[in-house]
Curated annotation (Swiss-Prot):
Keywords: Cytoplasm, Hydrolase, Magnesium, Manganese, Metal-binding, Nucleotide metabolism, Nucleotide-binding, Nucleus. It is found in: Cytoplasm; Nucleus. Mg(2+) binds at residue 36. This is Inosine triphosphate pyrophosphatase. Its cofactor is Mg(2+); Mn(2+).
């Protein structure tokens, strides 16, 4: 079985990736700090992956998550980590207070590079939901405020979330590509 270096310091992301890809490829974790540029989701993902492949001198997989508020024309997008850190769950809800439209889209973008100098390939998944006041255990980012069909991600068990999440959808595409192209 081939091995891939998943570049993350987030143990929750690592567990999800290993659970979904584990039967296709061995996922090793490399917790290195890769600087992120500002730009579109795709630009950020590709540049992060290029730098990761150079750093590990081998195959690299990186992930970037965005949360797009439709009422705010896609903001905060790829900057959700910083918005969440600064505002918290309540503050993010307050951003949408003036708007009727509480719809949001979770976007997960994985980028894979076979090594230094190789152009990264993008695999993206999206899940539509709506912003709600925080419910459930706050173990993983904005899960308590992202509602999908009546439950927040934080209220779902891991297996249920892994079947419908933006991350799962992106990983399903990556998994298929790995099986067909990178055996």
């Amino acid at each position: 079985m081939k091995t891939i270096n998943f570049i993350t310091g987030n143990k929750n992301k690592l567990a999800e990736v290993q659970a979904i890809l584990g039967d296709t490829i061995e996922v090793q974790n490399r917790a290195i700090d890769v600087p992120e540029i500002q730009g579109s989701i795709e630009e950020i993902a590709k540049e992060k992956c290029r730098k990761a492949a150079e750093t590990v001198q081998g195959p690299a997989l990186t992930e970037d998550t965005a949360l797009e508020f439709n009422a705010l024309k896609g903001l905060p997008g790829p900057y959700i980590k910083w918005f969440l850190e600064a505002l918290g769950h309540d503050g993010l809800n307050k951003l949408l207070d003036p708007y009727e439209d509480k719809s949001i889209v979770a976007v997960c973008t994985f980028a894979f590079s076979s090594g230094p100098g190789a152009e990264p390939i993008i695999f993206q998944g999206k899940t539509e939901g709506r912003m709600v006041p925080a419910r459930g255990l706050a173990k993983f980012g904005w899960d308590p405020i992202f509602e999908y069909e009546g439950n927040t991600f934080a209220e779902m068990d891991k297996d249920e979330k892994n079947l419908i999440s933006h991350r799962y959808k992106a990983l399903a595409k990556l998994k298929q590509w790995l099986a067909e192209t990178y055996p």
